[in-house]
Amino acid sequence: SRGLGDVYKRQPSQQDNLQDLIRTLRTSDAELGLAFDGDGDRLGVVTQEGEIIYPDRLLMLLSEDVLSRCPGGVVVYDIKCTRLLAPWIKNKGGQPVLSRTGHSYIKGAMQREKALIAGEMSGHLFFSERWFGFDDGLYAGARILEILSKSQDISKRLHALPQLQSTPEITLTLKEEGRNHEIIKQLQKNPNFPGAENIITLDGLRVEYKDGFGLVRASNTTPSLVLRFEGKDQDTLQRIKEVFYSALSSFVPDLDHYFSLSSPINHM
C-alpha cells in the first residue's frame, strides 16, 4: 500500500486545508492521505477517492481496535463529535465520556477517567494504551495504518464507519472581546429550542433532538462563537439550523452571511 503525507499550519481536519492532498490522491496510485499540522500533534485523513474521514469517525476506528484488547475501557471525546460516537463506543464494549473542547480539558478528562484513548474534532488524538497519554499526529497516523493494513480495501473500511449529514465548524467572529461568553450565558439562562430532547451545557449549548443536534459554544482562544449541526438528512439539518438562527439572531448581526457558509459536508 502507498500513502501520501502533507503538513498544514492550520487545522488538518478542515475541508479547505485538505484540497491539495485530495487533488494529489486523485492523480496518484496512493491508497490513503495523511495530513498534519505544523507541530505534528493533529491528524487529518483522506481516502483515495477524496473522502475526508473526520476525527470523530477516526475515533470510532481507533476505539474499536483499542477496546478489542481492553474491554470496558473509557473513551473521551469532545462536545463537537457526532452523536453516533457514544453508542458506537458502548456497542464495542467501552464507556464513552463527553468532555469540553480544548487540549487541556481533553487531557484532564483522560487522566481523571483513566481513559485508554481520547480525541476531539480538531484532530488531536490521545493514547494511553501502548503510548504515553499525549497527542501525537504521527503516532495516531501509525495506529490507523496498523489497523488498515489488515483490510483488503482501505477506502471501503473507512467509508463503512457510520455518519450522518453534518456541517463543518462555523465560526461567528464578534468585534467585542468577551461578548461570546456573554451570549452563551444568556442562551443558557433562557434557552429557547423547541422540540429539544436534551440541552447539554458542559461547553456552550449542545441541543439534542431525536434526529440530530446543534451546538453553539464560545471559542477558548478568540472572540467568536463556534457552531456545528448534524441531522439524519438534509431536511433535518436545515430545520435545526433554522432553530439556532432564530436563537442567535438577536445577538449576532449578519447571520445570513455565516449560515450561507454552512453548507453540509459532502458525504460520498
Task: Kindly label every feature range from the protein language model.
Residues S1-Y8:
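Short, small-residue-biased leader/transition segments that mark boundaries at the very start
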Residues G3, T27-D29, R112:
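Alpha-helix C-terminal capping/helix-to-coil transition sites in glycosyltransferase folds
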Residues K9-I22, Q188:
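N-terminal phosphate-binding loop and adjacent alpha-helix
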Residues L32, C70-M268:
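Phosphate-binding and adjacent anionic-ligand microenvironments
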Residues P12-D16, E51-Y54, D136:
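Alpha-helix N-cap and loop-to-helix initiation/capping positions
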